[in-house]
């Protein structure tokens, strides 16, 4: 089984997600105690997809995250670079236009999408700044980006408990339910190494996004960042 290192070599990350694809959604539901469904609902609200809009759902995995946008009447493109994830997504949701693509070199023309979103995927990209610039490039003027990512709890006592869960409790639980438990050791390590909420906001601004803001979910376990492409 593959476990990616924190230098996030693309072939390692893709292989790791290929390994967990079959049980990915179930494992996430169990490890997050069902909170992942709450977080994804908040993403859908922030994207605010409308009929006939074009939405890019990057790092869509099995495309479960794309369903709310499709139900809203938008044309959603689930995009991922794990072929294993895409195969599962195509089997489960054959009507969606699943697309293989790298976040640092997106296979779309400039100014294509009304909104772009990435949930729990930006942390796995080797070059975060290039990915943010690529998302900006493919977004129409006036469009928005919504990023949902694991982050850093703001209340110190809770942050301590959460860190203990990541490093001590999560790995054995993952061993019981995941087809590749080492992937969840990487998950814990990559969360600890991820930028803080203000740091990620600043990187969004440097990529060109305006009106950047964020709000914390579940006490900062997850942060929802949003920005706009100026008209």
Swiss-Prot record:
It is an enzyme of class 2 (transferase). InterPro entries: SAM-dependent_MTases_sf, UbiE/COQ5_MeTrFase, UbiE/COQ5_MeTrFase_CS. It holds the Pfam family Ubie_methyltran. Its EC number is 2.1.1.163. GO terms for biological process: menaquinone biosynthetic process; methylation. S-adenosyl-L-methionine binds at residues 62, 80, 102-103, 119. The keyword S-adenosyl-L-methionine applies. Pathway: Quinol/quinone metabolism; menaquinone biosynthesis; menaquinol from 1,4-dihydroxy-2-naphthoate: step 2/2. It catalyses: a 2-demethylmenaquinol + S-adenosyl-L-methionine = a menaquinol + S-adenosyl-L-homocysteine + H(+). The keyword Transferase applies. Signal peptide: none annotated. GO terms for molecular function: demethylmenaquinone methyltransferase activity. Keywords: Menaquinone biosynthesis, Methyltransferase, S-adenosyl-L-methionine, Transferase. Belongs to the class I-like SAM-binding methyltransferase superfamily. MenG/UbiE family. Methyltransferase required for the conversion of demethylmenaquinol (DMKH2) to menaquinol (MKH2). This is Demethylmenaquinone methyltransferase. It comes from Streptomyces avermitilis (strain ATCC 31267 / DSM 46492 / JCM 5070 / NBRC 14893 / NCIMB 12804 / NRRL 8165 / MA-4680). The lineage of its organism: Bacteria, Bacillati, Actinomycetota, Actinomycetes, Kitasatosporales.
């Amino acid at each position: 089984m593959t476990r990616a290192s924190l230098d996030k070599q693309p072939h390692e990350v893709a292989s790791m997600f290929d390994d967990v694809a079959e049980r990915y959604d179930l494992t996430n539901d169990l490890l997050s105690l069902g909170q992942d469904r709450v977080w994804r609902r908040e993403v859908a609200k922030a994207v605010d997809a409308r009929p006939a809009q074009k939405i890019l759902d990057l790092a869509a995995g099995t495309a479960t995250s794309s369903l709310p946008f499709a139900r809203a009447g938008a044309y959603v493109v689930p995009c991922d670079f794990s072929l294993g994830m895409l195969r599962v997504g195509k089997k489960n949701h054959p009507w969606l236009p699943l697309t293989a693509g790298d976040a640092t070199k997106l296979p779309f023309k400039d100014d294509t999408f009304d909104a772009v979103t990435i949930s729990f995927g930006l942390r796995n990209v080797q070059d975060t700044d290039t990915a943010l610039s690529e998302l900006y490039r493919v977004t129409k003027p006036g469009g928005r980006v919504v990023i949902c990512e694991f982050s850093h709890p703001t209340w110190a006592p809770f942050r301590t408990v959460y860190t203990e869960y990541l490093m001590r409790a999560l790995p054995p639980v993952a061993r019981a339910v995941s087809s590749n438990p080492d992937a969840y050791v990487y998950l814990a390590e990559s969360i600890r190494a991820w930028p803080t909420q203000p740091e990620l906001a600043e990187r969004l601004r440097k990529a060109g996004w305006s009106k950047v803001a964020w709000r914390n979910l579940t006490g900062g376990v997850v942060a929802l960042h949003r920005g706009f492409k100026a008209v």
